[in-house]
C-alpha cells in the first residue's frame, strides 16, 4: 500500500483482504494489477489479463533491485494507458527510485 500511495496510485481493491464475492465485480475496473507475491494472486491476474486484457506486474517489490524493476514496470503500464490522453506528459518515478535505493 505504501509504495502505491507514494507513487500516487489509487488502489481499486486488495484481494483477498476484506474482499467479498460482491466486490469481485469491481475487479475489471482496475487499469492493471500488482501481484506482490506470486504465490497469491498470479493465476487471478493471468485470468484477468486473458479475459479483460488487464496487464499485471508480478515482480515482488522487495529489495532495491526488484523494487526499482517493479516501479519501472508500473510506469510502463501507466505511460501506455495515459498515452492517448497525455501525449506529452509521462510519469517519472526515477527520483523516487533513487531516493529509495541510494543508500542501500
From Swiss-Prot:
Entry-linked SUPFAM superfamilies: Helical backbone' metal receptor
GO CC term (a single one): chloroplast
Keyword Protease found: no
Enzyme Commission number: 1.3.7.7
Catalyses which reaction(s): chlorophyllide a + oxidized 2[4Fe-4S]-[ferredoxin] + 2 ADP + 2 phosphate = protochlorophyllide a + reduced 2[4Fe-4S]-[ferredoxin] + 2 ATP + 2 H2O
Keyword Oxidoreductase: yes
InterPro entries in alphabetical order: ChlB/BchB/BchZ (IPR050152), Nase/OxRdtase_comp1 (IPR000510)
Biological process per Gene Ontology, one example term: photosynthesis
Cofactor note (record): Binds 1 [4Fe-4S] cluster per heterodimer. The cluster is bound at the heterodimer interface by residues from both subunits.
Keywords associated with the record: 4Fe-4S, ATP-binding, Chlorophyll biosynthesis, Chloroplast, Iron, Iron-sulfur, Metal-binding, Nucleotide-binding, Oxidoreductase, Photosynthesis, Plastid
Record Gene3D superfamilies: Nitrogenase molybdenum iron protein domain
GO molecular function: 4 iron, 4 sulfur cluster binding; ATP binding; metal ion binding; oxidoreductase activity
Cofactor: [4Fe-4S] cluster
Subcellular location per the Swiss-Prot or TrEMBL entry: Plastid, Chloroplast
Pathway stated in the Swiss-Prot or TrEMBL entry: Porphyrin-containing compound metabolism; chlorophyll biosynthesis (light-independent)
Binding partners and assembly: Protochlorophyllide reductase is composed of three subunits; ChlL, ChlN and ChlB. Forms a heterotetramer of two ChlB and two ChlN subunits.
Its job: Component of the dark-operative protochlorophyllide reductase (DPOR) that uses Mg-ATP and reduced ferredoxin to reduce ring D of protochlorophyllide (Pchlide) to form chlorophyllide a (Chlide). This reaction is light-independent. The NB-protein (ChlN-ChlB) is the catalytic component of the complex.
PANTHER family: LIGHT-INDEPENDENT PROTOCHLOROPHYLLIDE REDUCTASE SUBUNIT B
Entry's family note: Belongs to the ChlB/BchB/BchZ family.
Protein name in the entry: Light-independent protochlorophyllide reductase subunit B
Organism: Picea mariana
Amino acid at each position: 500500500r505504501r509504495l502505491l500511495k507514494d507513487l500516487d496510485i489509487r488502489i481499486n481493491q486488495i484481494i483477498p483482504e476484506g474482499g467479498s464475492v460482491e466486490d469481485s465485480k469491481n475487479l475489471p475496473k482496475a487499469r492493471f494489477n500488482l501481484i506482490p507475491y506470486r504465490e497469491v494472486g498470479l493465476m487471478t491476474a493471468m485470468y484477468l489479463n486473458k479475459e479483460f486484457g488487464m496487464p499485471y506486474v508480478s515482480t515482488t517489490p522487495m529489495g532495491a533491485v526488484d523494487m526499482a524493476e517493479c516501479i519501472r514496470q508500473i510506469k510502463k503500464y501507466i505511460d501506455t494507458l495515459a498515452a492517448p490522453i497525455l501525449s506529452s506528459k509521462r510519469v517519472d518515478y526515477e527520483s523516487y527510485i533513487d531516493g529509495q535505493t541510494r543508500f542501500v
